[in-house]
Amino acid sequence: GDCLPHLKLCKENKDCCSKKCKRRGTNIEKRCR
């Protein structure tokens, strides 16, 4: 699945983010921020 033009795809969880997809602290999985 692709994301809308103004959204970015978080490859780790295939989620569409309005912001960056990045890790939080010691968490391994990336999340929409």
Swiss-Prot record:
UniProt subcellular location: Secreted
Modified how: The non-natural D-maurocalcin (a chiral analog of maurocalcin composed of D-amino acids) completely loses the ability to stimulate [3H]ryanodine binding and calcium release. Its protease resistance, combined with its efficient cell penetration at concentrations devoid of cell toxicity, suggests that it should be an excellent vector for in vivo applications.
InterPro entries for the chain: Scorpion_calcine
Primary residence: secreted
Disulfide bond residue pairs: C3-C17, C10-C21, C16-C32
UniProt KW keywords: Calcium channel impairing toxin, Disulfide bond, Ion channel impairing toxin, Knottin, Neurotoxin, Ryanodine-sensitive calcium-release channel impairing toxin, Secreted, Toxin
MF annotations from Gene Ontology: calcium channel inhibitor activity; toxin activity
Listed Pfam families: Toxin_27
Region (Essential for stimulation of [3H]ryanodine binding to RYR): 22-24
Site (Essential for stimulation of [3H]ryanodine binding to RYR1): R31, R33
Tissue expression summary: Expressed by the venom gland.
Site positions for Mildly important for stimulation of [3H]ryanodine binding to RYR: K19, K20, T26
Site residues, Important for stimulation of [3H]ryanodine binding to RYR: K8
SUPFAM superfamilies xrefs: omega toxin-like
Outcome following mutation: K20A: 5-fold decrease of stimulation of [3H]ryanodine binding to RYR1. Biotinylated MCa: 3-fold decrease of stimulation of [3H]ryanodine binding to RYR1, and important decrease in cell-penetrating properties (PC(50)=1350 nM)
Superkingdom of the organism of origin: Eukaryota
One GO CC term on file: extracellular region
Reported function: This toxin stabilizes ryanodine receptor 1 (RyR1) opening in a long-lasting subconductance state (48%-60% of the full conductance state). Furthermore, it triggers calcium release from sarcoplasmic vesicles (6.6 nM are enough to induce a sharp release, and 60% of the total calcium is released after toxin (100 nM) addition) probably by acting as a cell-penetrating peptide (CPP). In addition, it has been shown to dose-dependently stimulate ryanodine binding to RyR1 (EC(50)=12.5-26.4 nM).
Homology family: Belongs to the scorpion calcin family.
Domains: entry comment: The presence of a 'disulfide through disulfide knot' structurally defines this protein as a knottin.
Name of protein: Maurocalcin
